[in-house]
């Protein structure tokens, strides 16, 4: 970012000129911002249709927008511009194909090319953030680049570049020199399968991924009513759990900033990998059959994917993280939970007891959710559907708060008793309001069970009621009505079903974040040991952990015993201060939104497992 401002600087958001392809370059002079116009963080989000470009009008936003408009590809979201240099793929936006991206160091025998990304390390002019630009032209011994957040004054008419950098060619190697004397150019990135002279993807040192235990000094901070029961949301949590977060509120866990950065990178990358696999599944009947979804729903699934693939609000990935690395267990893409605990209750815990310089890595979760809702295409009134489980009360209220922050009207429906039909067969709530947009806590699989109770041959289509003698509305009568916009969309059952895990492994074999998974116990799984998991199981139910000696290490019961199983490479959770610890990250709008921890004295995390306080320790 440019230091200071000059009299020639244009106000924030002013069009400064154009890069090749007619891609606009905007002023990012934040000192000129009108606080009233930009009082909400969501206003800074830049979108083209449903595709998130970045934060207005930073360098990353421009680079992603340039690639999107000119080549139809984007790179995954990053926290800082310098982190782009560690990415190794681009996503093709029309079909979610993943394309290889290679990084070449400054001074490489591989020449830079027009259209390549140029990446700076953090430091100097680009302190903390680093920088990214687009190489637009090689002009003799100069390279012309286009960028945002360096200059803030209009370009000369017709000029489609912001700066010229000197290029030195010596002994067959290409070195670019910046116009600033205190910066470091890492290199350039080219979309190609050719890996000659490219850098391998950097790997984080194992010790930086270690989860550590810590303690607060016990001054009685949590002896009384430390949660505010006058706040309806906190009160709903207290009604379900009391003034309690875990067995010992003075104990907490810490991770490094490097570990959080790795979680951000992994979450964003895995989300795109899951989307890529979902696209493959929905194009292949043989793959889709592996998910045991009623065949009568297949056309609706494909329509949902075609029309609403960018409408997912939030999900949760479950990881194992320790010195061995980072491995994903599964993606709860359909009906994830733990948002309230991570984004509110543990934030109150930190305010009440933690005095260090670290932070709760889910502190901004509700703001992220509000931002996602603002760009969701949801209708102005959203019905929030939950079952009558007391824990669902605060989960529903947390999402309601995010919706209100985003400007939506809402009504929470506890169970289905309030719903009915008007004279025309339209679905209405107890106040006579039409139900046409819902966010649900129910899993889609619950609705599928209602369909399985009816033979496909009895009906020409999904058996949705538009009336009933006892006014009995079922879940499928709401979620599968064509005019009802449901969040999360129907297609999210595919990434949320564990049948996708063997498909992911086949598409990305030996990927550093994946575990070998199959529909049978193959030879490799016999060697490593394996976890047996029902494909649509939830809450850690019906899981067996089997060692390479065929010894059962842990076993849980539940209601999913009749389901098809997958077999996943055994990768046990680390035991830290007496508990097995699982890392969970939230996706919001397809990008990382925060982290929390679950802890249990057994190897399998279950519904009743604790949420553990987590602090990211700053250097």
From Swiss-Prot:
Residue segments, region Gsp synthetase: 206-619
EC number of the protein: 3.5.1.78, 6.3.1.8
Knockout mutant characteristics: Cells lacking this gene do not produce Gsp under anaerobic conditions. Cells lacking both this gene and glutaredoxin (grxA or grxB) become hypersensitive to H(2)O(2); they are even more susceptible to oxidative damage than the single mutant lacking glutaredoxin only.
PTM comment, free text: Oxidation of Cys-59 to sulfenic acid during oxidative stress selectively inhibits the amidase activity which leads to a rapid increase in the amounts of intracellular Gsp and Gsp S-thiolated proteins (GspSSPs).
Effect of residue 173 to A: No effect on amidase activity
Protein name: Bifunctional glutathionylspermidine synthetase/amidase
Gene: gss
A GO term from the CC aspect: cytosol
């Amino acid at each position: 970012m440019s230091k200071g401002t000059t009299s020639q600087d244009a106000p924030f958001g002013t069009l400064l000129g154009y890069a090749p392809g007619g891609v606009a370059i905007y002023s990012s002079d934040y000192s000129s911002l009108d606080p009233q116009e930009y009082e909400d963080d969501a206003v800074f989000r830049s979108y083209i249709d449903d595709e998130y470009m970045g934060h207005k009008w930073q360098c990353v936003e421009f680079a992603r927008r340039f690639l999107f408009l000119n080549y139809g590809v984007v790179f995954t979201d990053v926290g800082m511009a310098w982190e782009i240099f560690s990415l190794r793929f681009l996503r093709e936006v029309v079909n979610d194909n993943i394309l290889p991206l290679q990084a070449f160091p400054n001074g490489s025998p591989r020449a830079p090319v027009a259209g390549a990304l140029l990446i700076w390390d953090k430091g100097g002019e680009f302190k903390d953030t680093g920088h990214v630009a687009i190489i637009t032209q090689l002009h003799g011994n100069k390279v012309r680049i286009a960028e945002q957040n360096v200059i803030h004054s209009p370009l000369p008419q017709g000029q489609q570049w912001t700066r010229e950098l000197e290029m030195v060619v010596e002994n067959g190697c290409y070195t670019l020199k910046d116009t600033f004397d205190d910066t470091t150019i890492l290199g350039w990135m080219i979309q190609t399968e050719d890996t000659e002279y490219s850098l391998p993807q950097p790997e984080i040192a194992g010790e930086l991924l270690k989860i550590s235990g810590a303690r607060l000094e016990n001054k009685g901070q949590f002896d009384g009513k430390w949660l505010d029961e006058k706040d309806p949301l906190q009160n709903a949590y207290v009604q379900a759990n009391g003034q309690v977060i875990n067995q010992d509120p003075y104990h907490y866990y810490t991770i490094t900033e490097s570990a959080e950065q790795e979680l951000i990178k992994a979450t964003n990358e895995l989300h795109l990998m899951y989307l890529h696999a979902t696209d493959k599944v929905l194009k292949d009947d043989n793959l889709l059959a592996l998910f045991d979804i009623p065949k009568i729903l297949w056309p609706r699934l494909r329509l949902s994917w075609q029309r609403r693939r960018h409408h997912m609000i939030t999900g949760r990935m479950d990881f194992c993280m320790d010195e061995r690395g980072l491995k994903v267990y599964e993606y709860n893409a359909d009906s994830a939970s733990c948002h309230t605990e991570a984004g509110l209750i543990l934030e109150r815990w930190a305010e009440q007891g933690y005095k260090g310089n670290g932070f709760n890595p889910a502190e901004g979760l509700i703001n992220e959710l509000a931002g996602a809702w603002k760009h969701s295409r949801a209708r102005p009134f959203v019905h929030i559907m939950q079952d009558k489980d007391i824990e669902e009360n605060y989960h529903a209220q947390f999402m309601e708060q995010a919706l209100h922050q985003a400007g939506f009207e809402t009504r929470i429906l506890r169970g289905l008793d309030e719903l009915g039909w008007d004279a025309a067969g339209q679905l209405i709530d107890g106040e006579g309001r039409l139900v046409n947009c819902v966010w649900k806590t129910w899993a889609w699989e619950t609705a599928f069970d209602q369909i399985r109770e009816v033979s496909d041959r009895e009906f020409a289509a999904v058996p949705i009621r538009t009336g009933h003698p006892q006014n009995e509305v079922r879940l499928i009568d709401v979620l599968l009505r064509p005019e009802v916009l449901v969040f999360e969309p129907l297609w999210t059952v595919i990434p949320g079903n564990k049948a996708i895990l063997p498909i992911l492994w086949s598409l990305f074999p030996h990927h550093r974040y994946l575990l070998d998974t199959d529909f049978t116990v193959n030879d490799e799984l016999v060697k490593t040991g394996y976890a047996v998991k029902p494909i649509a199981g939830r809450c850690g139910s019906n899981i067996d952990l089997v060692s390479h000696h065929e010894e059962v290490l842990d076993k849980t019961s539940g209601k999913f015993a009749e389901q098809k199983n997958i077999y996943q490479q055994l990768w046990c959770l680390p035991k830290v201060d007496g508990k097995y610890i699982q890392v969970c990250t939230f996706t919001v709008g397809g990008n990382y939104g925060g982290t929390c921890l679950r802890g249990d004295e057994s190897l399998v995390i279950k519904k009743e497992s604790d949420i553990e306080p987590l602090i990211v320790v700053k250097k």
